[in-house]
């Protein structure tokens, strides 16, 4: 399933987001709510669904490409390939299922292993189903403490009420954008350094 692409989008900045987490935590529901303003409660798990949408990020038109990966162990072997293509990750668990919170550590380790050559990986920890407070199994303090330990932001969302849905996607895109700008600056700095060295060498030869 994919959103329709319009002409002219190819020239816009593209931010690639990967949805990660156990099965049934609401990754697809969050994605569909963000994409189409729809709450889909029952969703058949697949290997992965890709979506693309044009949005305005801090006054700039950009594209967000969302890959919604399946959380089932059956797909663990192919998950590495999806992670390699990602620029940022929403690590999702359900606040009503502590086991899904525990699983985030393993998913994070897999991301870090696949992206080992990168310094700081844009990642947010997302506690979904905040509308089911009466069924909460994961205390806010516990989730926030884990996120702080990992040096990332923790946000609670509800795909049903749309609470903080836009926030997590836009905050992650900002982190991706910041990382890209930093990398481009480093590349330009190295290139400038090489040019200066080349100029000095030419001067010496003269």
Curated annotation (Swiss-Prot):
GTP binds at residues 21-29, 68-72, 128-131, 158-160. Alternates between an inactive form bound to GDP and an active form bound to GTP. Activated by a guanine nucleotide-exchange factor (GEF) and inactivated by a GTPase-activating protein (GAP). Gene3D superfamilies: P-loop containing nucleotide triphosphate hydrolases. Its EC number is 3.6.5.2. GO terms for cellular component: midbody; plasma membrane. Prenylation is essential for membrane localization. A lipid is attached at residue 203 (S-geranylgeranyl cysteine). Keywords: Apoptosis, Cell cycle, Cell division, Cell membrane, GTP-binding, Hydrolase, Lipoprotein, Membrane, Methylation, Nucleotide-binding, Prenylation. A motif (Effector region) lies at residues 43-51. Residues 180-206 are annotated as: Disordered. It catalyses: GTP + H2O = GDP + phosphate + H(+). SUPFAM superfamilies: P-loop containing nucleoside triphosphate hydrolases (SSF52540). It is found in: Cell membrane; Midbody. InterPro entries: P-loop_NTPase, Small_GTP-bd, Small_GTPase, Small_GTPase_Ras-type. The modification Cysteine methyl ester is found at residue 203. The keyword Nucleotide-binding applies. CDD domains: RalA_RalB (cd04139). GO terms for biological process: apoptotic process; cell division; regulation of exocyst assembly; regulation of exocyst localization; signal transduction. It is a lipid-anchor. Residues 180-189 have a biased composition (Basic and acidic residues). Residues 204-206 form a propeptide. Interacts with EXOC2/Sec5 and EXOC8/Exo84. Interacts (via effector domain) with RALBP1. This is Ras-related protein Ral-B.
């Amino acid at each position: 399933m994919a959103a329709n692409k319009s002409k002219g989008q190819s020239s816009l900045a593209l931010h690639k987001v990967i949805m990660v987490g156990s099965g049934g935590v609401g990754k697809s529901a969050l994605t569909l709510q963000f994409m189409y303003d729809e709450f889909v409660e029952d969703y058949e798990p697949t290997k992965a669904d890709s979506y693309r949408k044009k949005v305005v990020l801090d006054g700039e038109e950009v594209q967000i490409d969302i890959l919604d990966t399946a959380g089932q162990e059956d797909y663990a072997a192919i998950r590495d390939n999806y992670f390699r293509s990602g620029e940022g990750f929403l690590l999702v668990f359900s606040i009503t299922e502590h086991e899904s919170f525990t699983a985030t550590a393993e998913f994070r380790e897999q991301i870090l292993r696949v992206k080992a050559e990168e310094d700081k990986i844009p990642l947010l920890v997302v506690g979904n189903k905040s509308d089911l407070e009466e069924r909460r199994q994961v205390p806010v303090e516990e989730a926030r403490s884990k996120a702080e330990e990992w040096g990332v932001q923790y946000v609670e969302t509800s795909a049903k009420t749309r609470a903080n849905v836009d926030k997590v996607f836009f905050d992650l895109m900002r982190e991706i954008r910041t990382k890209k700008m930093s990398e481009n600056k480093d590349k330009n700095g190295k290139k400038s350094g090489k040019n200066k060295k080349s100029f000095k060498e030419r001067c010496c030869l003269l």
